[in-house]
Amino acid sequence: MKVLSVSSEVFPLIKTGGLADVSGALPIALKAFGVETKTLLPGYPAVMKVIRDPVVRLEFPDLLGEPAAVLEVQHEGLDLLILDAPAYYDRPGGPYVDPLGKDYPDNWRRFAALSLAASEIAAGLLPGWRPDLVHTHDWQAALTSVYMRYYPTPELPSVLTIHNIAFQGQFGPEIFPGLRLPAHAFATDSIEYYGTVGYLKGGLQTAHAITTVSPTYADEILTPEFGMGLEGVIASHIDNLHGIVNGIDTDIWNPATDPVVHTHYGPTTLKNREENRRSIAEFFHLDNDDAPIFCVISRLTWQKGMDIVANIADEIVAMGGKLVVLGSGEAALEGALLASASRHPGRIGVSIGYNEPMSHLMQAGCDAIIIPSRFEPCGLTQLYGLRYGCVPIVARTGGLNDTVIDANHAALAAKVATGIQFSPVTETGMLQAIRRAMHFYADRKLWTQLQKQGMKSDVSWEKSAERYAALYSSLVSKGM
């Protein structure tokens, strides 16, 4: 089976979040199930800089007003189609924002161009290759199925994956003529959304199947609390809604071979984590004692619950714990966490920014990772924690609920517990979870059991890829 995947970011070429990890890992995992994937992504400077010997496969003299070309290249096991459109993508800043952190004002056109190019490839314009199915990711690629509905490929099945419904791609109605869609596409069964143009909404209305990145999140987005205004649209397609948990690349994330980890280890050699623990203490200038090290590796935002972490940091220290934080985000939260580190030298360490190697070392050396998200479609850091024996302490929401088994009495007795869940996501709820963790940590035999059970969890892409392959086959066989 041939699949065209369309994504605005793909690891290891360009990454701002978990979307890139999925777009980069899923195609490789699908190979075991007979799925050949070509992934279309924009030709950002970071992408163009690393690709080697690309071949021009398709040219667009006028792609929504600008020239563009599709380049094909192999990169680290991925078969990539790069949309080389300098007018859209060759600019400073990130994939979506300028160097000052502001959204590019023409994002509507930049990602409509990506979707239009994808629909043309779906129609067979790429010489010698036409997909059996198109799989799009988030709002940046969601217009693909809209273009497919109104142009030559309405019969080709499409899947849309929602990685985070909070990001919907809504724009004013004045941009509609620039999309070059027929006038009747500006309708409630397509991209019209309360008088605006809704990219994600249009994708939801036109895709043949919708997936989210965990079963719990699939249920949550049907509610007003989590649906972000689109719960009614999603409910109208509930028969085509599927929750499939993400996996991680267990070759990259492997404590037995990870080149960043100072001392390698596995479930039977957990004592080797001590050297990594000392490295963490040194990096964050912590006291070298046996107190548990709790870590946070996250965007520092309200959605991620970082205000709660900042508010209880003093109490974590008062309970006898240590805290290290790696991340960046809202200035007020960065400041609050840095202030807590100043108040508690040797007990709290904060590093503002993102450091991929350090994120690996923190998973390998810290005792527990705190993930207090108010909503979390899937989450990856808890999967890394399970893999590395860094016990996850998570909010009971979304994919966190689906991937971490709470250490309640029954789960502990059955020796299946892998972490600690808490609800509600409040200061009180999180402090109760920290107290439970401190209690378990004091019983080293019990703590080691939690670590080992987590490390036995199957966090690979194999099961998830099998489910995606089955969904693809079902849609293709139905002739959607």
From Swiss-Prot:
Record has Transcription regulation as a keyword: no
Enzymatic reactions: [(1->4)-alpha-D-glucosyl](n) + ADP-alpha-D-glucose = [(1->4)-alpha-D-glucosyl](n+1) + ADP + H(+)
InterPro entries in the record: Glyco_trans_1, GS/SS, Starch_synth_cat_dom
Entry-linked Pfam families: Glyco_transf_5, Glycos_transf_1
UniProt-listed SUPFAM superfamilies: UDP-Glycosyltransferase/glycogen phosphorylase
One GO location term (cellular component): cytosol
Pathway(s): Glycan biosynthesis; glycogen biosynthesis
One example GO MF annotation: alpha-1,4-glucan glucosyltransferase (ADP-glucose donor) activity
EC number assigned by the record: 2.4.1.21
Keyword field: Glycogen biosynthesis, Glycosyltransferase, Transferase
Enzyme class: transferase
Keyword check for Protease: no
Binding site for ADP-alpha-D-glucose: K15
Job description of the protein: Synthesizes alpha-1,4-glucan chains using ADP-glucose.
Protein name, as recorded: Glycogen synthase
Organism, scientific name: Rhizobium leguminosarum bv. trifolii (strain WSM2304)
